[in-house]
Amino acid sequence: MSEPNFIIFLTDDQGYGDLSCMGCADFRTPRIDRMARDGARFTDWYSNSPVSSPSRAALLTGRYPGNAGVRSILAGHRTASGLPRSTPTLATQLKQLDYQTYMTGKWHLGLAESSRPHQHGFDRWYGFMAGCIDYYSHIFYWGMNNPGPGINPTHDLWEDGVEQWQDGEYFTEMITAKALAYLRDAAKEDRPFFLYVPYNAPHYPMHAPRAYMDRFADLPWDRQVMAAMLAAVDDSVGAILDEVERLGLADNTCSFFMADNGPSRETRNWL
């Protein structure tokens, strides 16, 4: 067997019980449930941190957050430092084994040039680098009530270090579209690949397309929008795994799904 391909799906602030395979009773996540049914389901899996940046640093480095150099939530301004360039990551190590490496989604490990995805082993990357963005304008609004030079709101959407403008498009679907494009590119090469897909959902702001909201019209609004956001992720995971199958890569691809750090009690929303 040739070297396996790897796909890591990550959700943001998703609760333990927000998937039907983990006990959710008021909505279903059939494609993620299928992963659990056909693979291994971990019922006692612990994040290395209760917040975003340290948990992501631990995932990508295999180190405790403090040893990885990321001990707290990182800032969102464009010169914010983050994961030290000297810290090895899964992407840097796989590149040494001639893997293609791709990321599409949320980074949150620094915006400074030395801390961006391409400095940490990713050949191609797409997404945003701060902690959260509006799902349609792709602007980081945190701190908007206290603006100042270099502070927020800040547009935060990039591809390979070049700022992108796709106003009005839903970010979950944008992540998925880029993942599908990366898969097709990867399949053309006679080399294995690593695809990292860190979704921003269901992190606030609580935004979902009307078509997804309409699926859950019987639920209270707060639960309705949570269900809608996770349904979009579930459909996206399914689309990516279907593409892996279509490309004839399924038998040699290991896919893994997890949440970053559990749910948030915050109530911020930007409309």
Where are the regions that the model predicts?
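Formylglycine-dependent sulfatase
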Residues: 1-271
